């Protein structure tokens, strides 16, 4: 970058100098013309010192006593001396007169100087283009020559630094063996995949895993982003691809990592896509096809939008191995926390198992941030060790934001928040299929006035209709509490309504849990464009019915346990934060509730209809088998769309 800026500055300086010289010469060579009568008057008054004739006596350059100059045209066929005599100017007042060619710059010379100036400007621009590429004018410089690898031995990361991804490491272990000892595979005629596509949510460690792969294989590591290839000028991206692969072959064995490959690997033929994207993608395909049998270069790409990639990228011989880097389970989260806690002084009361249980649905990047935030909190308080309280506070800050102690509610608003969060907690604690409540707080964090942390006992990939229905009721527990206690609702339920709308819509349009809409799926999200108006109306009405039924369930639970609601709310007003164990002591055993679920009356009666749970459910009787291969896509969709492990944040 410094070299680029220096060259651009020198070019701009040279251009400015040439322009100034050209302007100066032009101004000097072409004095401002004046009227002949005015010149004769100035000569009579003695203000003219010399006159230079030009153009065969048809023009004259007049120099004044103050050294200023003007240009005057002379009448054809008349000499300057005749004009002076006819004007009655005494000879002693005549200035020095020089014939043509003795001092004035000719028009031809002036034209030549202008042409030379234009040529010089063109040369400067040409040199800039040749030196720095076409993108050095008006955009950023090309990256040609800037693809520098991380060589073996530099900042080594190995599989020991990647925790919680044992299955993924097994998938890429043969690539490590191939890069270390390619002859063993060649003797057997084995062909190692040239491309590996890592897919999964952001923050799951795809980049870290690739660096560890290079470290284990002792290979050079090239890391680029898909957006780095594309520029305004057509052909720049393709040239960068060629340069990248050329350098990788020179530094073999090597691994090329292309992050966010969907930036250049989108399906071709779209109207809004420019030819620059197509040329860049074509060049990547050509380079991967051009690998020789003895080339020890492997391309690893990462994306979380595999559905939009061009099919040519995914065919055998290119990115023919696809590895899913999914969210870590509880055991993996425990291992990830241990890795990030290395070298940090932890207090004896730190319980990483408890923290792993509370962080369901978090990625490796989220967990690293929790550990780092806890270290910052300990340093801020000038303590020598990181305590368990630091970790729990860091978790709250990561999920809900820092506590806003300066934000003070009025006493009425504080009561509204307390009853709102108590409503969530009571409903979630009593319903048989809702997840357990870990924490309830009315401490303002971020934009939330309070929050209820509802985290499952175990990692879940599948959701039943009963679980989703109770989830809806728990989400609407805060709004129901406001209605019962204050007779009105507030804007604090906006986040709850967003979540209930998304879940109810998915239940009807994606998971076949509706009564009238049937076993149909409209795809991701709530897209109703592909449906007829009647079907879209039916889907909307059925989703609305699910929400209304869940709302009624929440009201019934809170009416039957009004004393529990009051106890929890008053305790929140006293201490502001309640954990799950204390919450269990505040809520009495469940009573027989008039729970109405009209949507289930039209369905077959479940054989294992569970009663309202006694106390806090441990979850062992509700575990769902995970060895169901035919529902893998449903499992991923459920995890991505519901994210039930995230705490419920209520903006009150």
Curated annotation (Swiss-Prot):
It is an enzyme of class 3 (hydrolase). InterPro entries: AAA+_ATPase (IPR003593), AAA_lid_3 (IPR041569), ATPase_AAA_core (IPR003959), ATPase_AAA_CS (IPR003960), FtsH (IPR005936), P-loop_NTPase (IPR027417), Peptidase_M41 (IPR000642), Peptidase_M41-like (IPR037219). GO terms for cellular component: plasma membrane. ATP binds at residues 200-207. It is found in: Cell membrane. Acts as a processive, ATP-dependent zinc metallopeptidase for both cytoplasmic and membrane proteins. Plays a role in the quality control of integral membrane proteins. PANTHER family: ATP-DEPENDENT ZINC METALLOPROTEASE YME1L1, METALLOPROTEASE M41 FTSH. This is ATP-dependent zinc metalloprotease FtsH 2. The gene is ftsH2.
């Amino acid at each position: 970058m410094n070299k680029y800026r220096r060259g651009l500055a020198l070019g701009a300086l040279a251009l400015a100098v040439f322009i100034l010289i050209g302007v100066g010469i032009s101004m000097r060579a072409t004095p401002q013309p004046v009227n002949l009568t005015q010149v004769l008057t100035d000569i009579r008054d003695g203000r003219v010192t010399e006159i230079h004739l030009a153009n065969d006596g048809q023009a004259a350059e007049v120099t004044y006593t103050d050294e200023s100059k003007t240009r005057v045209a002379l009448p054809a066929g008349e000499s300057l001396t005749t004009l002076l005599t006819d004007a009655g100017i005494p000879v002693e007042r005549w200035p020095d007169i020089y014939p043509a060619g003795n001092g004035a710059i000719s028009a031809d010379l002036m034209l030549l100087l202008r042409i030379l100036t234009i040529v010089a400007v063109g040369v400067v621009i040409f040199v800039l283009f040749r030196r720095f590429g076409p993108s050095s004018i008006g955009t950023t410089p090309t990256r040609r020559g800037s693809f520098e690898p991380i060589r073996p031995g530099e900042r080594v990361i190995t599989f020991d630094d990647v925790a919680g991804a044992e299955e993924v490491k097994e998938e890429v272990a043969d690539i490590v063996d191939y890069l270390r000892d390619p002859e063993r595979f060649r003797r057997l005629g084995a062909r190692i995949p040239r491309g590996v596509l890592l897919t999964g949510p952001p923050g799951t460690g795809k980049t870290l895993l690739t660096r560890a792969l290079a470290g284990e294989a002792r290979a050079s590591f090239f890391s680029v982003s898909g957006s780095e290839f594309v520029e305004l000028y057509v052909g720049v991206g393709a040239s960068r691809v060629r340069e990248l692969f050329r350098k990788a072959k020179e530094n073999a064995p090597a691994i090329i990592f292309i992050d966010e490959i969907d930036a250049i690997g989108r399906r071709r033929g779209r109207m809004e896509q420019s030819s620059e994207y197509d040329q860049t993608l074509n060049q990547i395909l050509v380079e991967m096809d051009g690998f020789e049998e003895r080339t020890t270069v492997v391309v690893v790409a990462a994306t979380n939008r595999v559905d939009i990639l061009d099919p040519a990228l995914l065919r055998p011989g290119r990115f023919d191995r696809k590895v899913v880097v999914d969210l870590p389970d509880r055991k993996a989260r425990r291992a990830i926390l241990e890795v990030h806690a290395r070298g940090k002084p932890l207090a004896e009361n730190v319980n990483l198992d408890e923290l792993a249980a509370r962080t369901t649905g978090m990625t490796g990047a989220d967990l690293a941030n929790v550990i780092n935030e806890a270290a910052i909190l300990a340093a801020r308080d000038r303590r020598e060790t990181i305590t368990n309280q630091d970790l729990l506070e860091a978790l709250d800050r990561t999920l809900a934001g820092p506590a806003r102690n300066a934000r003070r509610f009025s006493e009425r608003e504080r009561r509204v928040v307390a009853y709102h969060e108590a409503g969530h907690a009571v409903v979630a604690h009593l319903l048989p299929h809702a997840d357990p409540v870990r924490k309830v707080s009315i401490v303002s964090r971020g934009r939330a006035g309070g929050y209820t942390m509802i985290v499952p006992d175990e990692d879940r990939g599948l959701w039943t209709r009963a679980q989703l229905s109770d989830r809806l009721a728990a989400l609407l527990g805060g709004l129901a509490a406001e209605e019962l206690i204050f007779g009105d609702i507030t804007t604090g339920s906006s986040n709850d309504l967003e979540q209930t709308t998304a879940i109810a819509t998915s239940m009807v349009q994606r998971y076949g849990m509706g009564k009238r809409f049937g076993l149909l799926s409209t795809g991701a999200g709530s897209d109703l464009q592909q449906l007829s108006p009647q079907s879209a109306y039916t889907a909307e009405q059925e989703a609305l019915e699910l929400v209304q039924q869940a709302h009624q369930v929440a009201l019934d639970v809170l009416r039957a346990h009004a004393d529990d609601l009051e106890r929890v709310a008053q305790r929140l007003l006293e201490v502001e934060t309640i954990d799950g164990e204390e919450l269990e002591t505040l809520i009495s055993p469940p009573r027989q509730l008039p729970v109405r679920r009209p949507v289930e009356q039209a369905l077959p009666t479940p054989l294992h209809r569970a009663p309202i749970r006694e106390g806090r459910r441990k979850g062992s009787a509700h575990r769902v088998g995970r060895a169901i291969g035919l529902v893998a896509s449903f499992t991923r969709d459920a995890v991505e769309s519901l994210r039930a492990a995230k705490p419920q944040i209520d903006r009150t």
